Amino acid sequence: MEKVQQLGRPDLILLPGTKNTMGDLKWLRMNGLEASVLKLAAEGTLVMGICGGYQMLGLTLEDPDGVEEGGSMRGMELLPVHTVFEKAKTRTRVSGKTGTLHGPWQLLSGTAFEGYEIHMGETTYEPGGTVFSAIAETVGTQHVDEAMANGCQYQNAAGSYVHGLFDSVEMQKALLRLLCQKKGLPEEAVSWIDEKVYKEQQYDKLAEGLRESMDMAKIYQILEEGLA
């Protein structure tokens, strides 16, 4: 999305990750998209930020070491958090569960998810917001550290550092219930796709296409001769 006219009147605005949080926030500010998002948020539209989008939603962005743009700037001020960019980069797989959320986000409370973090900077909390989730680093299926706070929720805005947050079936269903309730629709009115199942179906189609276009008997013969 590049123009204010493309925004329309959505039920949920999702600000995704970015490699340059401060630079992209300046761009949103210059072309009027930030003002439009803030206007819709004031009218009750849900706003969710992931990673860099989460950082944008906070009160301030500080870059003392010049990791991105240098200096400091005001955030969108929808979440009571501050972000300070640091040279060290966080890269880790995580799993967790959303906390006891409030207002329009209540239906996401207590939902399990998996994903990963990859970002610069640390975010700290001001009083007033709710911790969005508790997460732990994972290796395979094992937690390797204690659960820690991640993300924030305040009124109709929320944010998280976790990429892939809505890939799980549980989170997809919870978000669907939330949006249906907000619009006064029965859950049955909207269909959803299990992304993991969909991916497996596409892999099966690809494998079948390869089998049809290749001499599988010859391939198996070569494999057997190589193992002999």
Language-model-derived ranges and their functions:
Residues 148-228:
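Acyltransferase
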Residues 16, 115-119, 158-162:
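Active-site-proximal beta-strand elements of phosphoester/diester hydrolases
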Residues 1-8:
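A short, well-structured beta->alpha microelement
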Residues 26, 35, 48, 55, ...:
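Feature representing long, continuous alpha-helical segments
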Residues 54, 83, 120-122, 164-166:
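Glycine-rich beta-alpha junction loops
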Residues 99-155:
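Catalytic beta-strand/loop cores that center a nucleophilic Ser/Cys/Thr
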Residues 11-12:
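Short, Asp-centered acidic motifs that coordinate Mg2+ and/or phosphate
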